[in-house]
């Protein structure tokens, strides 16, 4: 969900702006030179990939990975999130630009900044990405063709996810993290959607009914939409956090099972379990998810 927030932020503050693009770190110098001085046409997300399009038909493609993040700043016309991405634990701080100090020019970049984008009214710095590259239109199509459908995109076809699950003997908890099967579902959404739909994460994908697969798709879409709107991953229903509004749920009342191992389930009282599967920690309730 955070990549869709970044795409929205990029579109809001940079679309139609002629920008300077540089690489203070030096690792993206050649790519930055291809984009420097051009106008940003827009930005969109597909799963965990960000695509920023320019008027010369080239596209900046970024994947934050685990440690990457974008930082934004500017004058009173340049509003939005100050930092989006890792570190995940502190969430995102969002406030009107200029709240901290008047904008005159971007601050001196840190030596770790892979890519800096500067317009007349503000700037964006990228640090620690897994991917930062420039693509042609054909290369963009190739990258996107390898990605599964993104529930947040209006043109997403869930059938690709359904087919991937139906023919697989892998646990559904692993399939949900496979970006070639479904894009944008991270570790928290994986655990929480399976809990909410009362599905054992260790069940083979091919054992799930059409109804169960559809419910998983729709619930992940629902939770991702909330994530984009609120800026944090809130998966609990109001009745399971009485008196705690959605905007105040994070972190203590935000999730059912994620990071709650060893604690009693909110709904049935069974102890929440955690197990490492495919290199990531998977949380679930053995009582609710059978």
Residues covered by each model-derived region:
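Structured catalytic/nucleic-acid-binding cores of DNA maintenance enzymes
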Residues: 1-290
């Amino acid at each position: 969900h955070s990549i869709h927030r970044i795409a929205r932020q990029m579109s809001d503050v940079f679309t139609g702006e002629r920008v300077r693009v540089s690489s203070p770190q030096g690792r993206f110098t050649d790519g930055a030179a291809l984009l420097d001085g051009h106008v940003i046409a827009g930005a969109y997300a597909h799963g965990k990939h960000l695509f920023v399009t320019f008027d010369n038909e080239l596209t900046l493609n970024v994947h934050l990975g685990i440690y990457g993040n974008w930082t934004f700043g500017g004058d009173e016309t340049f509003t939005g999130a100050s930092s989006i991405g890792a570190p995940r634990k502190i969430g995102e701080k969002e406030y009107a630009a200029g709240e901290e100090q008047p904008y005159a020019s971007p601050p001196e970049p840190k030596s770790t900044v892979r890519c800096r984008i500067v317009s007349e009214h503000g700037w964006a710095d990228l640090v620690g990405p897994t991917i930062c590259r420039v693509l042609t239109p054909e290369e963009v199509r190739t990258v996107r063709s390898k990605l599964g459908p993104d529930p947040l995109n209006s043109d997403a076809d869930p059938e690709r996810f359904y087919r991937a699950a139906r023919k697989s003997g892998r646990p559904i908890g692993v399939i949900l993290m496979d970006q070639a099967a479904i894009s944008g579902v991270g570790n928290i959404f994986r655990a929480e959607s399976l809990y909410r739909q009362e599905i054992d994460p260790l069940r083979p994908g091919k054992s799930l009914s059409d109804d169960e697969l559809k419910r998983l798709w729709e619930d992940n879409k629902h939770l991702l939409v909330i994530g984009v709107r609120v800026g944090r991953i809130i998966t609990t229903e109001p009745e399971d956090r009485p008196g705690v509004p959605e905007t105040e749920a994070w972190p203590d009342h935000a999730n059912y099972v994620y990071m709650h191992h060893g604690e009693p389930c909110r709904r049935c009282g069974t102890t929440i379990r955690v197990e490492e599967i495919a290199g990531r920690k998977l949380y679930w309730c053995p009582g609710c998810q059978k």
